[in-house]
């Protein structure tokens, strides 16, 4: 149960949160529903301190035409700001979108799906896509109940499956006989797409929003395709490749096959405008790859009494990758809503690591790359320093350069990119 006016009065929210904290109940996770304009960063921080783990914002549509039809106003600027603020506080924003209103055309649905992708680019969010529901007493009900049909079960049609995961025949008979009473089990035809296609979008497009929002948005721009059309093509491509019935999509499907689909679609584009698409795809692939393994960070110390014989080994859960473009700059532009065509090529080294539920991506220089590569679990730090000195230590004494290597290893170890290997003792005495 959730109260959808919980944040309507700021004073009430603050009082509630302070009382929860005062009574020591903030270890109990809770969820709420909110308007975008009834919270701000300080309130969100207080809610998180009081135990709020997730909240739902009703976005509904990214189409101005559709928003006018349902008499709702959404400030896009506030939307993206609030999503970023909510996620930054450690609260997962659930964003509710609706597609398939009776007057909607392809462009209207494209606007909504594009908005969903942009929220996915901002970071950790939970997209929820639904089809319109006919509820008694609403204008939608009064205008369209007579054209309603039964094709697919939507969110509000679930909960009556009492016969091995299916509805009783008697329940089905009642729903069919009294559409005005059981209107939430009915669908509204939409000229843009069939109800079956809309249901596929509602069911599976959130996976793309979570895993590949950047690449998918770029792919739609490069191919000049409607986002929904492109997604349906992806599902059909996957169905043909896996020879699987019925049409479905899993997180594993996305990770294993979306890259191939992207490459095939891009190969059909005669004039490529954004040569950095494959860098963005690789960035999202590596983000998912490191997320599969989340080992606890180990305590890292160096015995300074035997520093020259210290051996470090790169954490196998950390991944290094060189990109052809400055991917962090491109992603910052994406988050600001800029999807420009051209960037100057610029080699960029990134290091990926997952710690608990947080993805860490840091930019490194060539020295750090080579240092990590030489930390193989066998070579003592003195040997690593000697091998790097010729390229990176020309303006330093060997002792000063060795000290800088020690400092770098300590930092990388504390951040979880290096682990302690064995130690080779007596090296100084033997030499």
Residues covered by each model-derived region:
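Glycine-rich Rossmann NAD(P)(H)-binding loop
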Residues: 2-6
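A structural motif corresponding to the C-terminal lobe/cap of the Radical SAM core domain
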Residues: 10, 17, 21-219
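Residues that form or immediately flank small-molecule/cofactor binding pockets and catalytic motifs
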Residues: 35, 132-134, 323-325, 355, ...
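Short beta-strand motif preference
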Residues: 55-57, 351, 381
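Short conserved micro-motifs at the rims of enzyme active sites and ligand-binding pockets
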Residues: 139, 331-334, 362-363
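Rossmann-like AdoMet/SAM-dependent catalytic core
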Residues: 214-236, 240-247, 263
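Long, charge-rich, low-complexity alpha-helical segments
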Residues: 241-304, 356-431
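Long, low-complexity, charged/polar intrinsically disordered regions in eukaryotic proteins
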Residues: 302-357
């Amino acid at each position: 149960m959730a109260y959808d006016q919980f944040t309507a009065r700021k004073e009430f929210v603050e009082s509630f949160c302070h009382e929860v904290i005062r009574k020591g109940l903030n270890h109990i996770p809770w969820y709420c529903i909110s308007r975008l304009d009834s919270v701000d960063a300080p309130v969100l921080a207080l809610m998180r301190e009081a135990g709020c783990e997730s909240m739902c914002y009703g976005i509904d549509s990214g189409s101005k035409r559709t928003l006018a039809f349902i008499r709702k106003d959404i400030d896009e600027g506030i939307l993206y700001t609030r999503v970023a603020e909510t996620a930054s506080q450690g609260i997962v924003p659930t964003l509710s979108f609706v597609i398939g209103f009776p007057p909607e055309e392809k462009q209207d649905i494209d606007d909504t799906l594009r908005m969903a992708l942009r929220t996915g680019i901002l970071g950790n969010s939970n997209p929820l896509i639904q089809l319109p529901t006919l509820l008694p007493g609403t204008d939608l009900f009064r205008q369209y109940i007579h054209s309603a049909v039964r094709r697919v079960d939507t969110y509000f049609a679930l909960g009556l499956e009492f016969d091995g995961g299916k509805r009783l025949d008697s329940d089905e008979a009642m729903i069919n006989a009294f559409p005005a009473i059981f209107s939430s089990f009915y669908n509204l035809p939409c000229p843009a797409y069939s109800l079956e296609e809309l249901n596929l979008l509602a069911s599976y497009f959130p996976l793309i929003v979570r895993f590949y929002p950047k690449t998918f948005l770029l792919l739609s721009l490069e191919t000049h395709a409607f986002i929904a059309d492109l997604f349906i093509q992806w599902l059909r491509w996957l169905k043909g490749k896996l020879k699987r019935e019925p049409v479905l999509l899993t997180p594993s499907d996305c990770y294993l096959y979306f890259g191939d689909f992207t490459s095939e679609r891009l190969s059909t584009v005669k004039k490529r405008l954004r040569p950095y698409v494959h860098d963005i795809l690789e960035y999202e692939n590596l983000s998912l790859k490191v997320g599969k393994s989340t080992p606890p960070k180990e305590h890292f110390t160096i015995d300074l009494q035997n520093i020259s014989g210290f051996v470090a080994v790169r954490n196998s859960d950390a991944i290094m990758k060189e990109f052809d473009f400055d991917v962090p700059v491109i992603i910052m532009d994406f988050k600001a809503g800029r999807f420009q065509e051209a960037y100057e090529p610029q080699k960029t080294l990134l290091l990926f690591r997952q710690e608990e539920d947080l993805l860490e991506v840091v930019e490194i220089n060539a020295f750090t790359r080579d240092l990590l590569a030489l930390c193989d679990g066998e070579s003592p730090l003195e040997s690593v320093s000697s091998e790097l000195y010729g390229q990176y230590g020309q303006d330093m004494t060997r002792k000063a350069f060795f000290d800088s290597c020690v400092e770098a290893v300590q930092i990388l170890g504390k951040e979880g990119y290096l682990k302690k290997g064995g130690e080779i003792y007596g090296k100084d005495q033997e030499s």
